[in-house]
Amino acid sequence: PSTGMPTKSEQTDLLQALYGRNGESPMPVIAATSPTNCFDAAYMAAKIALEHMTPVVLLTDAFIANGSAAWKLPNLDEYPAINPPYVTPEMEGTWTPFQRNEKTGSRYWAVPGTEGFMHRIGGLEKSNETGVISTEPENHQKMTLLRQAKVDKIADCIPELEVQGDADAELLVVGWGGTYGHLYSAVEHMRKNGQKVALAHFQYINPLPKNTADVLKKYKKIIVAEQNLGQFAGYLRMKVPGLNINQFNQVKGQ
């Protein structure tokens, strides 16, 4: 983000990534955790974008950008396939521009120029199914809910939240994005000194992993450490009410 201190690192644009659009416009948000994780994060962002027909925000930070690590070129055959919801010839004559896939809630992709699938696109609100411009109140309400549901369903396609550290810990350290290396080192240092502590680091921000609430509610105390004034902590409080969340916030550009 723009820190006012060029080349310095912060995590101060999380809420902008989540909500910085006109109206209720939910969008998936992913945060890379390290230089070596950037490729995997970008691949998954592309997979989500193409399979669910949605823009995706992929967050990095200056610390990741200026960092380096050994990275072995991956075998792409080991990555999950990307399967966009293309229209099929059998759909010609019955397809409508806003017809949705029942599993994902996404529209089918009629690539421009595909014979028999001509349609209009644009930034104005559309009527469900037909894609015709509409300002009807009930339709706008329905379309807003459909867009939110589409993003929510992405939780079915992302990995569950993993916890590292002591299985019997009462304290959970929570982070997201490029602070992973520092938080992991801090947690390991505490464990070597005899403290029972665990780490949960988030890469998928919106939607959150499906098991997020189950994981967080196991711990008596949670410390959310981030380079802002508590944006992710507030987001977690909203998504999982009732947690004992404590904040550790620094905005020092490092």
Give, region by region, the residue ranges found by the protein language model.
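Flexible glycine/proline-rich, aromatic-decorated loop/lid segments
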Residues: 1-24, 238
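Short beta-alpha connecting loops at secondary-structure transitions
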Residues: 1-5, 24-31, 244-252
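Short, well-ordered, mixed-charge alpha-helical segments that flank or form enzyme active sites
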Residues: 2, 37-38, 65-68
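Residue-level detector of functional hotspots within protein domains
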Residues: 3, 15, 24, 42-44, ...
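Conserved structured core elements
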Residues: 8-11, 32-39, 141, 177, ...
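Short, contiguous clusters of charged residues that form electrostatic/catalytic patches at enzyme active sites
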Residues: 12-15, 40-43, 181, 210
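Active-site/ligand-binding-proximal alpha/beta "capping" segment
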Residues: 25-49
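Flexible, low-complexity linker and terminal segments
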Residues: 46-254
